[in-house]
């Protein structure tokens, strides 16, 4: 299991054990993390699982695909460290990953 810390816009933290092979979004949804709406269910089609990856983890989460880049155009307050959490596959290498959630997904 990889421990992932989800930090809400207000600073509240939730640390979740996520099984390798799942996505950061799936870990959030399975554990009722507020702020990850995941309207499309993880199909990279809605941008409602937008997160900010902690700078220390950017290299370990992999590159954004062209599709993810396109979908981020629909997210609010996009930053250079913005990712769609449905596109970050959890592995043991991501144990300790920290992501911050935007104020709103819509």
From Swiss-Prot:
Q: Where does [2Fe-2S] cluster bind?
A: 40, 46, 49, 86
Q: Electron transport: present as a keyword of the record? A: yes
Q: Which UniProt keywords apply?
A: 2Fe-2S, Electron transport, Iron, Iron-sulfur, Metal-binding, Transport
Which CDD domains does the record associate with it?
Answer: fer2
Cite the SUPFAM superfamilies for this sequence.
Answer: 2Fe-2S ferredoxin-like
Cofactor(s) demanded: [2Fe-2S] cluster
Annotated Gene Ontology cellular components are:
cytosol
Q: Name one GO molecular function term.
A: 2 iron, 2 sulfur cluster binding
- The 2Fe-2S ferredoxin-type domain is annotated at 1-105
The domain of life for this entry's organism is: Bacteria
Q: What is this protein called?
A: 2Fe-2S ferredoxin
Lineage, top ranks: Bacteria, Pseudomonadati, Pseudomonadota, Alphaproteobacteria, Caulobacterales
